[in-house]
Amino acid sequence: YNIEKTLLCAQPNKLCLDAVQKYPDRIIGLVYPNPHDGQKAVDMIYDYVQNKGFRGIKANPLKDAYVADDALMDPIMEAAKDLNIPVFMHCGHPPYSLPWSIALLAERHPDVKLVMIHMGHGHGVYIDATLKMAKRYPNLYLEMSGMPMPSKIREAYEEVGADRIMFGTDAPFHPAVVEAMKVMTSGLNEKQLADVFYNNCAKLMGFDKK
């Protein structure tokens, strides 16, 4: 399905930068700020995007101990809007990264494309909530690593939007073959599989225009 690149993030960001510089044609870097760092985090985003070639932002409320819609995230989102890059946010662990909190952040920043990574993770209530929130807010996108229900991938494709659900692995935490098999057994046809596996992410990140 034409998978030829991967999105990568790491803390410290220098680890990701080393990988991007070593494999520039295969790795797309996501800068990984801690919103608690305030202006320092914003400055780092601009540096990594404008000077080091990174093309998105990773946010993890669970790891960095803030609620997804906390005002701490507003400067990060404003930077994303200014730079025209998407934000990828960990989704599915209370109390930090619940779908409705992420939706409130998306509502405040309608011009920023915000990807709910893990699509609610392993909790059925959170998975259904990601779908509901994504239907409500067109700037919300879904990534399905760690989400155990293949049927929800097809539901997202058909009900949220054909271009707003994408494959991911969350490597090294989940086996890539398991994540791929979830998509393969979701009931999507070949064109739809190509969208989920590659085309949608390529469009979101802008490397479909090469």
Predicted regions and their residues:
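Catalytic pocket-lining loop regions of alpha/beta-barrel enzymes
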Residues: 55, 69-166
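Active-site gating/metal-coordination segments in enzymes
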Residues: 4-5, 12-88, 136, 140
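Active-site beta-loop-alpha junctions enriched in small/polar residues
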Residues: 11, 32-36, 60-64, 90-94, ...
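Short, charged, surface-exposed secondary-structure boundary motifs
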Residues: 39-42, 66-68, 124-127, 152-153, ...
